[in-house]
Regions:
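Transmembrane-helix motifs of polytopic, lipid-linked glycan transferases
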Residues: 17-18, 94, 98, 102-128, ...
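Transmembrane-helix signature of polytopic, membrane-embedded enzymes
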Residues: 19, 82-91, 95, 114-142, ...
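Short helix- or helix-capping micro-motifs
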Residues: 20-24, 136-141, 148, 168, ...
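Aromatic-rich transmembrane-lumenal/periplasmic boundary elements in polytopic membrane proteins
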Residues: 35-68, 72-75, 240-320, 467-482
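Short acidic/glycine- and proline-prone juxtamembrane loop motifs at membrane-interface regions
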Residues: 39-40, 145-159, 200-203
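Interfacial juxtamembrane loops and adjacent helix segments
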Residues: 58-109, 308-315, 320-322, 327-344, ...
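Membrane-interface transmembrane helices that cradle and orient dolichyl/undecaprenyl
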Residues: 126-127, 166-187, 216-219
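Transmembrane helical bundles and short interhelical boundary loops of multi-pass, membrane-embedded
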Residues: 181, 225-232, 236-260, 264-266, ...
Length: 503
């Protein structure tokens, strides 16, 4: 086994990794500042970033790390002469013609780019084959929905990076659990990346389920379990507290035009801390954190529910997400009145449908392994159980959320689905009457990678804001459930019609 592990890091491995880095640069990072126009939640996140840059106190529905990174990109690159136009509002509008998005979008696009290399390493640990790993990376590199969203000043770029990092560290921890120093390192890093997830978006809480999976592998060694918990908690608390402390320490200035005269429903104790300039004190930390959690709960209670009867509803039911429904038109414009540029959250159907099929096949493999154990047992049954359980648990969790959710909320299970697809590839030994050799799997994966690339190119205009005629747009609306609608069309959701909205 050790020889097999050492043979992973060959010249071929680094060449294929370089190939993945280059391709993902071209899809995620190249000219990420285009279009030079705001879309979707950038109005909110740029306003939040400017508050950090100007020391303005505020609270928001999401934890602070993603928005701190958006602000850091603008601080580092500094492409704009001003960074204070929107400190008096939570929703930035009327962007000047020369406004540059290069700084605000930097970290989302940058981390989105490097997520591909982390996925390559995950696939390498599973397949032990750099060629297979590079083509499996096509699932991420050429997915149109991930690309268009992550290239914006959004939270999903950092979130996907941290989630991918946690999966990678989880696999490395399991692989090196017999080597004490590496085990302690990966245990600490697991806490660090989980803290990064939880300070970016609370939706990433589902990754807490990787901890019981680690404990299961460590049983019955109570001493090792104790060391794991100590390292994990140290890593988690150090980052979690540091991120929130930076958020509180930066917010010293109250701007009265913001909600609740700039206090965002802060408690009297927090108002006193603001008045005396003590928000950076660690003694103030519990008070400010309590208020921040209270505001998150308050904000989500006020968020509307999904209403498919609304003609402008962009949300979608969670059970539609695996097949790419519903697409979202982020923005559009027409250069000449005959063609139209769209920025659309539209899936690569080959990626999403293949991933969903892999999840279904994984469930079948697991059920079959228990009900009718095959002569050759599953090689990766534990990992299949972990990641299929993670995928299913996400949907159980979101099914209990009453507020409206959107297609990009599926990005976390989609990422997990990519890992499941790699595990299924390694487990499937026969296809009908044919035995699947390693060469057969490689050939099949190359064909699939080619289909992914062709599909990516087909939907490329909707990803990179390229002009289309109405006829060209209509040819891309393959599945009605996507509701891929041109500027001249009307969204008619089949579920809403069935509910008889009274239109």
């Amino acid at each position: 086994m050790s020889a097999q592990k050492s043979s992973l890091w060959t010249t071929h491995t680094f060449l294929f990794l370089g190939f993945v880095v280059l391709l993902s640069y071209l899809t995620y990072f190249h000219h990420y500042w285009e279009p030079q126009a705001v879309f979707w939640d950038e109005n909110y996140h740029i306003a939040s970033a400017q508050k950090y840059l100007n020391g303005v106190y505020f609270m928001e529905q999401h934890p602070p790390l993603g928005k701190l990174l958006i602000a850091a990109g603008e601080k580092i690159l500094h492409p704009n002469a001003r960074a204070d136009q929107y400190i008096g509002t939570d929703y930035a509008t009327n962007f000047p013609p020369d406004f540059s998005f290069k700084g605000y979008r930097f970290f989302s696009a940058f981390l989105g780019w490097w997520t591909a290399s982390l996925l390559f390493l995950i696939f390498l640990l599973i397949t032990r084959n750099p060629l297979l790993s590079s083509f499996l990376s096509f699932f991420y590199i050429f997915d149109n929905a991930l690309i268009v969203h992550i290239r914006g000043a959004m939270l999903e770029g950092p979130l996907e990076f941290f989630c991918t990092a946690m999966i990678l560290v989880f696999l490395l921890l399991l692989e090196h659990r017999e080597r004490q120093r590496l085990f302690l390192l990966w245990s600490t890093l697991l806490g660090v990346v989980f803290a990064c997830i939880m300070t970016t978006k609370i939706l990433g809480l589902v990754f807490i389920l990787l901890i019981p999976a680690v404990l299961w592998k460590l049983l019955p060694d109570g001493r090792t379990i104790g060391r794991f918990f100590v390292c994990f908690l140290l890593g988690f608390l150090a980052v979690y507290i540091a991120v929130w402390h930076i958020h509180f320490a930066l917010g010293k200035r109250v701007v009265p035009t913001l909600p609740d005269n700039g206090y965002y429903q802060a408690s009297p104790a927090s108002k006193q801390l603001l008045a005396t300039g003590r928000t950076g004190s660690f003694l103030a930390f519990p008070i400010l954190l309590r208020d921040a959690f209270g505001f998150i709960a308050h904000y989500n209670r006020g968020t509307p529910r999904l209403d498919l009867c609304k003609p402008d509803e962009n949300g979608s039911p969670f059970f539609d997400w695996p097949i790419g429904a519903r697409a979202i038109n982020y923005r559009w414009e027409t250069p000449d009145g005959n063609t139209y540029r769209y920025l659309y959250l539209q899936s690569n159907p080959v990626v999403w449908l293949t991933t969903f099929a892999a999840v279904i096949l994984a469930i079948c493999l697991l059920v079959g392994s228990f009900l009718a154990p095959p002569r050759q047992p599953l090689t990766h049954r534990f990992l299949l159980m972990v990641f299929t359980g993670l995928y299913a648990s996400f949907f159980v969790a979101v099914s209990r959320i009453s507020r409206v959710l959107y297609l990009y909320h599926y990005f976390i299970p989609l990422l997990v689905g990519f890992v499941i697809a790699s595990l299924v590839l390694m487990e499937v030994k026969k296809l009908g009457r044919w035995n699947l050799t390693e060469y057969g799997k490689t050939f099949g994966l190359i064909v699939l990678a080619a289909l992914i690339f062709v599909s990516f190119q087909f939907y490329r205009p909707l990803t990179y804001y390229e002009a289309l005629t109405d006829a060209q747009f209509a040819r891309r609306a393959i599945l009605p459930v996507w509701e891929l609608t041109s500027v001249h069309g009307t969204r008619t959701n089949a579920l809403a019609v069935a509910k008889n909205c009274g239109n």
